[in-house]
A protein has these predicted regions:
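Short, well-ordered loop/turn elements at secondary-structure boundaries
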Residues: 35-36, 101, 110
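Short, well-structured hydrophobic secondary-structure segments
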Residues: 23-75
């Protein structure tokens, strides 16, 4: 598997990043909000959906970082920032434009958790940080996406 590195400057770019982040696991301790820098950085373990397809599927994960710049506010719904050991399952990342070029980025987690970012403009980056490792199973829980969107 080749390392991924994507930059998102619009909704279409973010949709590509969201696809690669479906079913990534995130420890609450790995969510870093820097209000003075207007930056949110998330360390996560993303599932490699491309390796899970084909005649000989392999289930792998890779450590990655997701970074958002120009973040004016970050709010949590059903995510306890004090619960540092909790592990969240990322289902999707969405962008809703408000005052162009600004808008709201939503990171939707299974169980209804949401991180809501108010951004001056969409500026995000996803980058793999190291080698992959194998895992035993492919993630499966489609109904949670509807719950998270509420």
């Amino acid at each position: 598997m080749q390392s991924l590195k994507f930059v998102a400057l619009d909704e279409e770019d973010l949709a590509i990043i969201s696809t690669h982040l479906q079913d990534a696991t995130v420890k609450v301790a790995d969510v870093l909000w820097r209000p003075q820098e207007k930056r949110l950085v998330i360390g996560l373990d993303r599932f490699d959906w491309l390796s899970a397809e084909g005649d000989k599927p392999e289930f792998r994960r890779c450590r990655a970082a997701l970074r958002f710049e120009r973040v004016a506010a970050c709010k949590c719904k059903q995510v306890n920032p004090a619960g540092k050991a909790a592990v969240l399952n990322l289902l999707a990342v969405e962008f809703e434009p408000t005052d162009t070029p600004g808008g709201v980025v939503k990171l939707l987690f299974s169980g209804g958790g949401v991180l809501r970012l108010e951004v001056e403009c969409l500026e995000a980056e996803l980058a793999d940080l190291g080698p992959t490792w194998t895992v035993d199973m492919r993630p499966a829980h489609v109904a949670d996406v509807l719950d998270a969107r509420g």
